[in-house]
């Protein structure tokens, strides 16, 4: 469901895929070829949420903000299943592992990898191209070429899947308009 909030309506690129049972409210911008997967909630009712191009926000994630602290997700970011992002900045091509929590004013550097289940506390800065793990998250090493290739593969896969599902949605809508279901 897409809901306006106090005069702000989500702006979603035509090429973005928004799965069924996603809720998006208020001051939210979603870029080209971005995919938002099932049961995700993106609330822009406190401050803006800006999501770049070719981002994937996987199932059951929650995105929100604190007053005067927007949530910014740059191009090419992967957000794993059941992630909580709250008033953070996630730089280009980063990957946030499943079940992680990224809190207010944290900044995830370009190409950084946050391991599954990690907690990045308020204000913490994770350097570019590093792997951070734990609760609280600590940098454990620089990323390898294999890590970087795998992150790129995941990004490409989610863009392709998103476009596939987008085409299915359009086909379903077209059939429903004609009162024909496949």
Swiss-Prot record:
Pfam families: Hexapep. Reversible hydration of carbon dioxide. It comes from Geobacillus kaustophilus (strain HTA426). Belongs to the gamma-class carbonic anhydrase family. Its EC number is 4.2.1.1. The keyword Ribonucleoprotein does not apply. This is Carbonic anhydrase. It catalyses: hydrogencarbonate + H(+) = CO2 + H2O. Gene3D superfamilies: Hexapeptide repeat proteins (2.160.10.10). InterPro entries: Hexapep, LbH_gamma_CA-like, Transf_Hexapept/Carb_Anhydrase, Trimer_LpxA-like_sf. It is an enzyme of class 4 (lyase). Changing residue 64 to A: Retains 20% of wild-type activity.
């Amino acid at each position: 469901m897409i809901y306006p909030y106090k005069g702000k309506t989500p702006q979603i690129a035509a090429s973005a895929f928004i799965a069924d049972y996603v809720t998006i409210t208020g001051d939210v911008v979603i870029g080209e070829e971005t995919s938002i997967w099932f049961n995700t909630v993106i609330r822009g009712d406190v401050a803006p949420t800006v999501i770049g191009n070719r981002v994937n926000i996987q199932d059951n994630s929650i995105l929100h903000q604190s007053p005067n602290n927007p949530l910014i997700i740059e191009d090419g970011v992967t957000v794993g299943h059941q992630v909580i992002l709250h008033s953070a900045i996630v730089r280009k091509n980063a990957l946030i592992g499943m079940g992680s929590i990224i809190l207010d004013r944290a900044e995830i550097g370009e190409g950084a990898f946050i391991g599954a289940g990690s907690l990045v506390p308020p204000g913490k800065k994770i350097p570019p191209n590093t792997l951070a793990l734990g609760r609280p998250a600590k940098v454990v090493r620089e990323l390898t070429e294999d890590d970087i290739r795998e992150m790129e593969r995941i990004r490409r896969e989610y863009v392709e899947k998103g476009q596939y599902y987008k085409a299915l949605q359009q086909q379903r809508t077209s059939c429903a308009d004609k009162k024909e279901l496949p």
